[in-house]
């Protein structure tokens, strides 16, 4: 799971870094927002630590990667608010581990309105 998520994020990093104006020595900053369902899950904590470490290896002189990790604390409404905070903070990509697998619609709508890619991991969205 960590390798798949890392590969997807890596692809997005490369794709999004191609979107910047690279005239001169301008450093591109890529902001990755990771929102988990709970901060009490050891597997999710290990996964997010691995993702953060992997993204650190992808940094270069031209590309800086900032990873912000927040928890929904087992509450879908709180997770939606955290996603909105990440969008307002300027995240370029969101990685979401849903609290409620049947409630991804608000997150998708918020991200789509800002043209931000969303990766759902470990908990696949499902219909009610």
Can you say where each PLM-predicted feature lies in the sequence?
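Short, low-complexity disordered leader/linker segments with a strong preference
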Residues: 1-30, 87, 109-116
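A generic local structural motif
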Residues: 19, 80-81, 106
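Short helix-terminating capping/connector loops at secondary-structure junctions
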Residues: 26-27, 61-65
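Extracytoplasmic "Venus flytrap"
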Residues: 31-54, 58, 68-84, 89-91, ...
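Helix C-cap/helix->beta junction micro-motif
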Residues: 58, 62, 114-116
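Structural signature of beta-strand start/N-cap positions in the alpha/beta core
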Residues: 92-93, 117
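Flexible loop/hinge segments that line or gate small-molecule binding clefts
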Residues: 101-128
């Amino acid at each position: 799971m960590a390798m798949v998520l890392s590969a997807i994020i890596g692809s997005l990093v490369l794709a999004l870094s191609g979107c910047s104006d690279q005239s001169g020595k301008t450093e591109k900053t890529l902001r990755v927002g990771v929102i988990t369902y709970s901060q009490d899950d050891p597997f999710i904590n290990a996964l997010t630590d691995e993702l953060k470490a992997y993204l650190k290896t992808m940094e270069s002189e031209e590309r800086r990667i900032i990873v912000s990790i927040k928890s929904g604390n087992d509450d879908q409404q709180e997770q939606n608010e955290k996603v909105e905070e990440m969008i307002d903070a300027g995240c370029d990509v969101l990685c979401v581990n849903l609290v409620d697998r049947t409630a991804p619609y608000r997150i998708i709508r918020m991200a789509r309105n800002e043209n931000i890619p969303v990766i759902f991991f470990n908990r696949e969205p499902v219909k009610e």
